[in-house]
Amino acid sequence: SVSRGLGDVYKRQKYTKENIIKYLKNPETNAKQLRNASIYLYEVSSQYRRVVNYFAHMCPLNYIMYPFKFDATKEINDKAFKASYKKATDFMSIFNLRHEMRKALTIAWREDIFAGYIYQTKDSFYIRKLPADYVKIASIVDGCYIVAFDFSYFRGKEDELESYGQEFIDKYEIYKKDSSQRWQLLDEKKQFCLKISEDVTYPLIPLAGCLVGIYDIEDYKDLQKGASILRNYKALGLKLPTDETGNLLIDKTLADQFYAQLTNITPDNIGVFETPMDVQVFDFEKSGAEDPDKTYEAIRNFYNDVGVSSLLFGSDKQTAASLNISITADECLTFAVNRQIERNVNRLLKNLSGTQKFQITILDISEYHRQQFHDLLLKDAQYGVPVKSAIAASVGIDQPAMNAMLFMENDFLKMHEKMIPLSSSYTLASGDEAGRPTAEENGEEISDSNENTREHDSNASR
């Protein structure tokens, strides 16, 4: 077991390697213990934290917005349509999707479930994480998970009630009058819940399979450290001469004086001893070819347990093609979670007043393939595919920002009139004359042959 370094911290927190193995044998029963272990390891293990953040931060969450259940065959009330669109873009502006979801995704990839309660004013929006031990998934509405809250949480914590809001105050009063009302559903319009492991009903840590590997890394670090100390340790044996009967041939006091002198000049990693016997050396060090870096191997195995390429985190040797395939497989996992985010946001957008509802789609872009996706959209645009909003979104300009920037640049600042590019082959109109400057323009005389060429337009057919 781990005996030094992080191992001491693990033991103090009662999360040993043996505990994790035991929890994994029955993850449903031990869901709480696995979640708490995952939270703690996220804080103390750089490898685990990087893997969680790798999945949580992979997608920039760029999105486009368009009408929901739009019927182009019916006459559109332009004023009502614009009013509904304005409400939707205003909502997405205060939502701040990328920031709120970055926090939510980090928690979800670490704990499997993120359950939050929405606090919204006219100009602000915030999703508060609910304590994981006091929420459970109770139903599904419009494809979104809906949770119930355990109001026994506030027993002895009544001072926190006001910060949670009126719904919690009212339902806690219900619980105090009737203890059977411990679990109560929260207003579905104020909930936001994500679950990474959608294939199981109970909380299952998405990266649970690699938790044991964290301890293996620490074990091998300790072994490597011990081996390194051993390789650098030397011992000097002072053999005292003896006669055939074993009696010392020199005075022991004199031998001790030489021993003391030697110990005073030797460094800490060199030991000195006296012996009347021959000393035989036993070397436990293996050759470099036979002694692979076990710590490196443990780190590589850790990433293999997760299912991601260790090359992403500075180890292992793979080809660019295999790395790209590995990232693509990881992207598929994160894109699936994006669909949950879409459904939650669209459920909230449906609650807005207005004759026309709007919805969003999060583009399947990752930080690793952003440029390829952007180039693909530009090619699609050449064939008339309506991707202008997607092109803007792919570079981080979402719909509310795009509307504002179009007005600022074109109508207010009139940049298209004031920012005049230098003349070049890209900016000249097709009717402009091309070719090098004429002889007259260069201040030179025209030769007879050039004059004849101009008169007969001999270069026209070239």
What are these regions (language model features)?
Residues K11-Y40, E167-K190, Q261-P267, G271:
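An N-terminal domain-start capping segment
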Residues R12, K22-K25, T29-K32, N36, ...:
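Conserved aromatic-histidine-acidic binding/catalytic patches
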Residues P27, F55-F68, F95, A108, ...:
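Generic structural signal for hydrophobic core residues of well-folded globular domains
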Residues Y42-Y202:
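Structured, mid-chain assembly/scaffold modules that mediate subunit interfaces
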Residues R98-A115, T253-Q261, D283-A390:
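C-terminal amphipathic alpha-helical
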Residues Q181-T319, F358-H369:
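Extended, charged amphipathic alpha-helical segments
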Residues D256-Q261, I265-T266, I325-A329, L333, ...:
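C-terminal anchoring/interaction modules
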